[in-house]
């Protein structure tokens, strides 16, 4: 059952944009693998929740590449396909900054924050990492990203480089809007 005119969900503009999002946002940090964190639910439990959210008009789903090392994004992509949810009916927010292990292992959060060794150039907001992270998120989701948020401010990367890379992923059509998560206004 798709959302109908009788849906009680209310929608609001996202910031100063024209994009409308549900006032309630479904956070998907807890979707993925308990190997990442013991409180995470698996795909079989998460998929029906995404379907129900869609059915009641909750059209905004928030995830990040680092959640369960990419599994959260994969589950959202599977829900779109499994339930034939029209892509234009949901708003997908994702984030980049933290590293995602290439080998499919579930590194602890602390290991995904170090831009060195095995994770060099896979953490932070360098142009390289932003472009790679977006491509990888799109591969996991199977679709474009409506809102890409930086998950933290990267003080080691020039702000101009960050903003140029974010602009470029929007200009490419891979991302529709940009934003920030866990960043204070004064940080800039």
Annotate each language-model stretch with its function.
Residues 96-98, 184-185:
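Glycine-rich beta-alpha junction loops
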Residues 84, 95, 101-115:
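Eukaryotic helix-linker segments that join adjacent hydrophobic helices
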Residues 34, 106-188:
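Glycine/proline-rich, positively charged
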Residues 1-91, 100:
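N-terminal binding-site loop/beta-alpha segment at the start of enzyme catalytic domains
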Residues 75-79, 91, 95, 129, ...:
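Generic beta-strand or strand-like secondary-structure segments
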Residues 66, 95-97, 153:
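Beta-hairpin (beta-strand-turn-beta-strand) motif
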Residues 26, 63, 94, 147-150, ...:
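Conserved beta-strand positions
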């Amino acid at each position: 059952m798709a959302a109908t005119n009788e849906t009680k969900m209310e929608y609001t503009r996202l910031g100063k944009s024209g994009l409308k999002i549900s006032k309630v946002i479904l956070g998907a940090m807890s979707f993925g693998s308990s190997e990442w964190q013991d409180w995470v639910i698996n795909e079989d439990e998460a998929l029906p929740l995404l379907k129900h959210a869609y059915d009641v008009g909750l059209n905004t789903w928030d995830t990040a590449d680092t959640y369960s090392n990419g599994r959260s994004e994969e589950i959202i992509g599977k829900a779109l396909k499994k339930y034939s949810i029209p892509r234009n009916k949901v708003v997908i927010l994702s984030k980049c900054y933290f590293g995602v292990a290439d080998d499919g292992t579930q590194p602890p959060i602390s290991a995904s924050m170090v831009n060195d060794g095995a994770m060099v150039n896979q953490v932070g907001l360098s142009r390289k990492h932003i472009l790679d992270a977006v491509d990888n998120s799109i591969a996991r989701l199977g679709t474009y990203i409506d809102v890409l948020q930086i998950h933290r401010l990267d003080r080691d990367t020039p702000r101009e480089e960050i903003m140029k890379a974010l602009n470029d992923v929007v200009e490419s059509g891979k991302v529709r809007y940009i934003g920030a998560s866990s960043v204070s206004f004064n940080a800039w």
